[in-house]
Amino acid sequence: KMVDAVCRSGDCSLTPLAAVAGSFSDLALEKSLEFGAERVIINNGGDIALKDITGNIIKVGIPVNNKELVLSIDSQSKINGICTSGIGGRSFTKGIATASVVLGETAAMADACATCIGNAADVESDGIVRCYAEEIDSETDIPGNLVTLSVGELSKKEIYRALLNGIETAEKLYNENIIKGSILCIKDKIVMFPENSSYFTLEKIYA
């Protein structure tokens, strides 16, 4: 499952570990349903597998920059995975996304694609500090790859360029029916693709 998710993401720089957290969430979801659960939400450090077989809407909060985005998921949508990648997460990122959120049919697929889109959401800027992955973790699975350490002040042009790079990747994955949607946040800017979906809504932003 991990290998398949990474291969389908189209990012040849990813290893199977890009989908490990989502895959374990999927496994916990499957086992819960086998034991008769009707509404299951498994949150593995922000990589979520979810399913409601009763037909009720599932709401998921995503904290970003002291705000909370609230996603409402239609139980008929086949969205069973919501995963997040970006700066400050448990894993490395090559991009500058505050949060790269992906909705997919499985958490494994959403996990790999959140990493892929997060990596693509990038721009060259003096405000970005990077280093090689092995300088932080000698046992990393991506030695030789530059990863983002911190993101300082960015111009609006730099932010919009990075958002565009990320959302173009999201659009490609969406058009190939690999993901159900994506939300990308850089600093205080937030974009969603597709902008209008019958399967999910970005309901509210709580300050």
What kind of region is each of these model predictions?
Residues 1-43, 105-192, 201-207:
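Alpha/propeptide regions of enzymes that mature by internal proteolysis
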Residues 10-104, 109-110:
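Glycine-rich anion/phosphate-binding loop at the beta-strand->alpha-helix junction
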Residues 55, 61-62, 196-207:
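Conserved glycine-rich phosphate/nucleotide-binding loop
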Residues 68-74, 192-197, 202-204:
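Short amphipathic beta-strand/extended segments with alternating polar/hydrophobic composition
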Residues 91-92, 190-194:
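Short active-site-adjacent structural elements
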